Amino acid sequence: MKGTFLICLILIAGFSFKSTQAGSICLEPKVVGPCTAYFPRFYFDSETGKCTPFIYGGCEGNGNNFETLHACRAICRA
C-alpha cells in the first residue's frame, strides 16, 4: 500500500514538473538566431496567445521553437 502511494506521488510530481517546463518554454521569446539557414518554424506568442510562424536561422534558438503548428499547439495549448 505504501509502495503504491509512493509510486503515485512520484508520477504526479513528474507530470507537474513536465507541465511547468512546458509552460515556461511557451513564455520564452522568439529567437531567430544569428545563423542564416531557412527553417520554417512556429513559436507561441504569449501576447496573442497563438502559435505563429517564423523563420529560424538554425542556431542559438530556445525551446519555443516548434517544427509544426500541431506541436506548438499541443505543448502550449493554443
From Swiss-Prot:
InterPro entries: Kunitz_BPTI (IPR002223), Kunitz_BPTI_sf (IPR036880), Prtase_inh_Kunz-CS (IPR020901), TFPI/VKTCI-like (IPR050098). Keywords: Disulfide bond, Nematocyst, Protease inhibitor, Secreted, Serine protease inhibitor, Signal. It is found in: Secreted; Nematocyst. Gene3D superfamilies: Pancreatic trypsin inhibitor Kunitz domain. GO terms for molecular function: serine-type endopeptidase inhibitor activity. The record marks 67 as: Important for the stabilization when complexed with trypsin. Its main location: secreted. Coiled coil: none annotated. Residues 26-76 form the BPTI/Kunitz inhibitor domain. The keyword Secreted applies. Disulfide bonds join 26-76, 35-59, 51-72. Residues 1-22 form the signal peptide. GO terms for cellular component: extracellular space; nematocyst. The record marks 36-37 as: Reactive bond for trypsin. It comes from the Eukaryota. Serine protease inhibitor that specifically inhibits trypsin (Ki=73.8-78 nM) and chymotrypsin (Ki=993 nM). In vitro, it shows cytoprotective activity in the oxidative stress agent 6-hydroxydopamine (6-OHDA)-induced neurotoxicity model. In this model, it decreases reactive oxygen species (ROS) level, and increases cell viability in a correlated manner. It is possible that the observed effect is due to the ability of this peptides to act as free-radical scavenger. Belongs to the venom Kunitz-type family. Sea anemone type 2 potassium channel toxin subfamily. Does not inhibit potassium channels (Kv1.1/KCNA1, Kv1.2/KCNA2, Kv1.3/KCNA3, Kv1.4/KCNA4, Kv1.5/KCNA5, Kv1.6/KCNA6, Shaker, Kv2.1/KCNB1, Kv3.1/KCNC1, Kv4.2/KCND2, Kv4.3/KCND3, hERG/KCNH2) and TRPV1, the capsaicin receptors. Does not inhibit the serine proteases plasmin, thrombin, kallikrein, the cysteine proteinase papain, and the aspartic protease pepsin. A synonymy between H.magnifica and R.crispa is controversial. This is PI-stichotoxin-Hcr2e. It comes from Radianthus crispa (Leathery sea anemone).
